[in-house]
Amino acid sequence: MDNKLEKMKKLVEELNQYAYEYYVLDNPSISDKEYDLKYDELVILEKETQVTLPYSPTQRVGDKILGEFSKYTHKGRLWSLDKAQNMEQLIEWHNRNLKVIEQYNSMSEDKLPELRYIVTKKFDGLTVNCTYDENGILIKSATRGTGIIGEDITAQIKTIKTVPLKIKNNHVIEVHGEAIMTKTAFEEYNKAAQVPLKNLRNGAAGALRNLDIKETARRNLSAFFYDVGYNEGPEFKSYREMMNFIRNMGLPQDKYIKECTNMEEVEKEIEYIESIREELDYDIDGAVIVVDDIKTREILGYTIKFPKWAIAYKFEAKEITTKLLDVEWNVGRSGRVTPTALLEPVELGGVTVKRATLNNMDDIKRKNVKLGAKVLVRRSNDVIPEIMGVVEESLEESKEIQAPDRCPYCNSHLVQNGVHYYCENTLSCKPQMVKSIVHFASREAMNIAGFSGKTAEQLFERLDIKSISDLYKIRKEELLTLDKFGDKKSQNLIDAIENSKNCDLASFIYALGIPNVGKKTANDLVMKFKTLESIKNTTIEQLVEVPDVGEIVAKSIYDFFEDEKIISNIEELLNLGVKPYYEEERIDENPFMGKTIVVTGSLNNYSRGEIKDKLQSLGAKVSSSVSKNTDYVLVGEKPGSKYEKAIELGVKVINEEEFSNKIK
């Protein structure tokens, strides 16, 4: 029995260390298979001995559903933070601190040091308090609650794999952190969720307030820790020392921690945090600025609600509520009919928002969105805002959104395929034909210079262009009948159409508008199969062998080339003189061949598209995110969080000059 217990202790220590390496350091030292074997061995030993250590990894997810939440009194108070909405308010706070310190130093021989601040991100999640006992074992986790009394969420916190169940510490401490849901976890959860989550914060809060622990685990939460609220061990002299302690205990901690000695430096860091906000895989809603020196904190003291030595700088909201006035149905080039929400105008992120995305009727029903109701709107980057959910209290006088049964443009009957509605009138439905022609003529496709959406509309309405192949039948005399088409413009378009006949195969494949096939996938298909005939006759099994092509994309490609009408149109294009060609490019040996490269920041000699093309021409794979599998990160001016991630993981970083020298 003793041998088995010793073996269990060893396995638990090993598995917890492996989990720390995998989830926190992102640097695993063993394979998943080896981990699983050790985990299974531990499960067997626990069954045999009927003993389970409180910090065993098997205790992270239980089968039971809890009856209710119990209260927990925090050993140390969890304070709220005062807020600054602009730099003027932040400078006022700084000046108050200076005044108190000057007064103290004028009256005391034990002088306080010059003010130094620590700037960190303000995470938009749920504040949690984790208590570790004198043996380093996690014995309690709780919500902030009133700051004095919270709710016990120990079982829920144990589902967060980055939170250690045991730390190497021999005195009681309480550690404060923020439980968050990453964008990656949010998207994965919503793919299979019957009721999709509205936003990341609700996802995290709902998980920790759920009595079904398995549901909490399904949310796949993360956490960052940033404060020791109660400590029976040696006192800290500075916040930097406290943060080092938190990190050394193996608690997950954000890498961004900046020291500042004046407000100019603080402002610069705030601007930087805001600039990388959208690149992060989690939500932040501001920056936190705290006094570093602990004794100075004691002198500054507290108000009834806030510590005077800390403040939060709040960024502009990315979400807001407004009224849904109506729904507009639009037709894409594939014939898919999609809804767009028409909103009561509202300011969000410095922009007046009047429209928002509603993906499909299934999305509308799951989110319970109704006409006249108040909806939660989110805007990320510069993309069209999306409706994330509805304010339940506003539903009383709202009306159901009705799915259309006819095309809003050509009045044809719609057919339902999965969650989407389609107009099958491909020949005379204006939006479909116009968008298909514009896509076919675009720069990355057939590159027909001087072609525009307005030109496509005139070709459809005035020259009766009903298919892509009809483009190659247009005569100059016909173009002269169109608005704003003189002799020169007409001849230029005729020449551009003629010149497009000699095109590379990847551009032709992309121009065809195969569902789910972008330019990269088109390039990958050509690299794999070499000829149009081979691509047309390939199987789903062969298609999934192409990099980044899964079963859904493979089926889209296969079904596309099974359509007799499409094959007929392709044959007509070839008969009209379109000659797609493929020349296997010989790539000379170079340092980037076969390497995975991430680009961040602005480059002097390349646009983002140009550097991507250049790297691919060198045989490199261009990735959008940094991981331990990244070979190089090419850094330009004002790099984002990808640069920090590269430094953290030890990935080779090169600038534009070094890149140019390597390819000479």
From Swiss-Prot:
Family annotation (InterPro entries): BRCT_dom (IPR001357), BRCT_dom_sf (IPR036420), DisA/LigA_HHH (IPR041663), DNA_ligase (IPR001679), DNA_ligase_CS (IPR033136), DNAligase_adenylation (IPR013839), DNAligase_N (IPR013840), Hlx-hairpin-Hlx_DNA-bd_motif (IPR003583)
Entry binding sites for Zn(2+): 407, 410, 423, 429
Position of the signal peptide: none
Listed EC numbers: 6.5.1.2
Recorded superkingdom: Bacteria
CC cofactor: Mg(2+); Mn(2+)
Positions bound to NAD(+): 32-36, 80-81, 144, 178, 314
Name this polypeptide is given: DNA ligase
Source organism (scientific name): Clostridium botulinum (strain 657 / Type Ba4)
CDD domains: BRCT_DNA_ligase_like, H3TH_FEN1-XPG-like, LIGANc
Domain BRCT as annotated: residue spans: 587-664
Membership in a protein family: Belongs to the NAD-dependent DNA ligase family. LigA subfamily.
PROSITE patterns per UniProt: BRCT, DNA_LIGASE_N2
Transmembrane segment boundaries: none
Keywords: DNA damage, DNA repair, DNA replication, Ligase, Magnesium, Manganese, Metal-binding, NAD, Zinc
UniProt cross-references to Pfam families, sorted A to Z: BRCT, DNA_ligase_aden, DNA_ligase_OB, HHH_2
Listed GO CC annotations: cytosol
Gene Ontology MF terms: DNA binding; DNA ligase (NAD+) activity; metal ion binding
Functional description taken from the UniProt entry: DNA ligase that catalyzes the formation of phosphodiester linkages between 5'-phosphoryl and 3'-hydroxyl groups in double-stranded DNA using NAD as a coenzyme and as the energy source for the reaction. It is essential for DNA replication and repair of damaged DNA.
Reaction equation(s) it catalyzes: NAD(+) + (deoxyribonucleotide)n-3'-hydroxyl + 5'-phospho-(deoxyribonucleotide)m = (deoxyribonucleotide)n+m + AMP + beta-nicotinamide D-nucleotide
GO BP: DNA repair; DNA replication
Active site location: 122
